[in-house]
Each structure stands twice: as C-alpha cells, then as structure tokens.
Amino acid sequence: MPRRREVPKRDVLPDPKFGNVEVAKFMNVLMLDGKKSVAERIVYGAFDQIEKKAGKAPIEVFSVAINNVKPVVEVKSRRVGGANYQVPVEVRPSRRLALAMRWLREAAKKRSEKSMALRLAGELLEAAEGRGGAMKKRDEVHRMAEANKAFSHFRF
C-alpha cells in the first residue's frame, strides 16, 4: 500500500426517511453484499415495530440505545518483556460509534425472533432501557478494563 497521503474519510449521506446520518451509518453496518435496499427494509421495519411496541419516536429510541451501548474504555494487548498485558485505553469517539453499531448488529443476530427487523427492534428497545446483549458486551469490555487498571501505565 502506498504511504503517500492519508485518504480522507468520506461523509455518509443522511438516510432518506429520517435525514439522520447515524441511521444511514447503521444501515451500512447492517448491509451484506452491497444490498442496501434490504438493509433499509430491515431498519425501517424495526423502527415501525418500535413505534408499535413502545409508542415512542424510533429515532429517539435508536439514539438512546446507541449512546447506552457506546464503550468508554477498552483493552489493547501490549507486549512488555515477554509478557502480554491487557492495557486499558480510552476509545476514540468514531470507534465508540462503530463498536456500538457492530455490537447492536451482532446481539440482534443472536436473538430468537422470526425476522431480523423484529430482532433489531427488540435489541434497540432493550439497549435503550439498559438491558440486552449489546449492553452485556459493553459491560464485559468495561469490566475487562477495570480488572486491568493496574497496567494502565503501559500507555500506547
């Protein structure tokens, strides 16, 4: 790979229905094999379910869920004198969002509801309330960082 210059990040266009950039990014995370229309159908279907079940604005539920799942710290492996240490580091804001979206997707995939839209709706509602698989993953990452606090002086 050439090392001439850093390639600029492309801006994601907001989604057509809600005009929200985070929703568009989430669709891109959800998309498989470039099938954006399928990802859109899943997300909008999940939002319809959220409106039916909770009676709240789906965009608000989505943003609360994302903010709840965002990790503050994570651990990175660092080799020092023949031993690997799990060093807690703060997570960059862009990575926080990416991890939260990825964890929500994976937690929704593991659920038992019939369609992906129903699974995603259930996971988003639970994450907004501070429960669910994605929240469990975030808490696990935070616990790992807390347990390895002693190695935080091995900064990167």
From Swiss-Prot:
Record function comment: One of the primary rRNA binding proteins, it binds directly to 16S rRNA where it nucleates assembly of the head domain of the 30S subunit. Is located at the subunit interface close to the decoding center, probably blocks exit of the E-site tRNA.
Gene designation per UniProt: rpsG
One GO MF term: structural constituent of ribosome
PANTHER family: RIBOSOMAL PROTEIN S7
Name of one Pfam family that matches: Ribosomal_S7
Family: Belongs to the universal ribosomal protein uS7 family.
NCBIfam families given in the database record: rpsG_bact
Keywords: Ribonucleoprotein, Ribosomal protein, RNA-binding, rRNA-binding, tRNA-binding
GO BP: any one term: translation
The protein's assembly and partners: Part of the 30S ribosomal subunit. Contacts proteins S9 and S11.
Protein's name according to its UniProt entry: Small ribosomal subunit protein uS7
Gene Ontology cellular component terms for the protein in this record: small ribosomal subunit
